[in-house]
Structures are given as structure tokens and as C-alpha cells.
Amino acid sequence: MEIAVLGLGCFWGPEIKFSKLEGVIKTEVGYCGGDSKTVTYKEVCTCNTNHAEVVKLDFDPKIISYEKILNFFFEIHDPTTLNSQGPDFGTQYRSEIFYLSDRQKEIAESVIKKVNLKLSGNVVTKSSLLKNYCPAEEYHQRYLEKR
């Protein structure tokens, strides 16, 4: 089992999309990259905590590779818009890959470079070491499935 943590705008839609990928065992939405270990949705929405909304994936690397997950990540959001996706604006909606190992860092930077070449150098996606991840409140988990 391996873990991927990805920021790509509001976490509700991407969570559903990732959950349908073969090899993804579990998804969880949360907050990552901020200044504190625990945070609430209300606090994140102030844009003062430096957290991003993220989807955390548990996946089987024998079925789907980290690189394929990152390629899908770039397919399902716009990596050229800074701190926004669709109608949502704020630093919590940034495009960011949170890596957990040197190997993930290398893969992330390689994929970002390839996508950047394809998109004429306009990619704003960052890669950062996983820091201060905490799960989002229960009502956010599988939110769109509950509606």
C-alpha cells in the first residue's frame, strides 16, 4: 500500500474521481501544508492557516503507479490557475502535490516538468514535503455521494 496526497481545488469532486480509479483502495479528504497540525474547514477558509484542501489516496502500486495517479491528477484539474479552481478562489484551492518520500518527490517533479512543457510553461503546481495533514470533518468525507 502507498499513499498520495494531492491538492487540486475543492476536494469533493476529485475525491469521487480518484475513488473510481482501479487500484485506489481508499480516499479521504483533508487539509495539508499549513502551519498547525489540526485545523477546521472554517479556519482553512480564512486563508490564514496556509493549508490546502487535499485528497489522500491509499493505493496499490502493483495495480496503479504513483506516476499514473499524478497524470490523472493533471487531467482532472487546471494546473495553470493560481490559488483557484473553477468558481473557487483562495490559497486552500491551490494545485500542489505533497510527497512522502524522495522517490515520490522525483516522480512529482518529473511529471510537473512534462506537463509544464505541454502547457507552454504555465503550470503553477508545486511539490512539497507532506506537512501537517489532518482529515477534514466527517461531513466532507464522500460529500457528493451523500447528496
Swiss-Prot record:
Keywords attached to this entry: Oxidoreductase
EC number annotated for this UniProt entry: 1.8.4.11
Enzyme kind, highest EC tier: oxidoreductase
Location of the active site: C10
GO biological-process terms attached to the record: protein modification process
GO MF term set: L-methionine:thioredoxin-disulfide S-oxidoreductase activity; peptide-methionine (S)-S-oxide reductase activity
Reactions performed catalytically: L-methionyl-[protein] + [thioredoxin]-disulfide + H2O = L-methionyl-(S)-S-oxide-[protein] + [thioredoxin]-dithiol; [thioredoxin]-disulfide + L-methionine + H2O = L-methionine (S)-S-oxide + [thioredoxin]-dithiol
Domain of life assignment: Bacteria
Alphabetical list of Gene3D superfamilies matching this protein: Peptide methionine sulphoxide reductase MsrA
Keyword Oxidoreductase set for record: yes
SUPFAM superfamilies: Peptide methionine sulfoxide reductase (SSF55068)
Presence of keyword Protein transport: no
InterPro entries linked: Met_Sox_Rdtase_MsrA_dom, Met_Sox_Rdtase_MsrA_sf
One Pfam family of this chain: PMSR
Protein family per UniProt: Belongs to the MsrA Met sulfoxide reductase family.
Protein's job: Has an important function as a repair enzyme for proteins that have been inactivated by oxidation. Catalyzes the reversible oxidation-reduction of methionine sulfoxide in proteins to methionine.
NCBIfam families recorded: msrA
Matches recorded under PANTHER family: PEPTIDE METHIONINE SULFOXIDE REDUCTASE, PEPTIDE METHIONINE SULFOXIDE REDUCTASE MSRA 2
Name listed for the protein in its UniProt record: Peptide methionine sulfoxide reductase MsrA
Gene: msrA
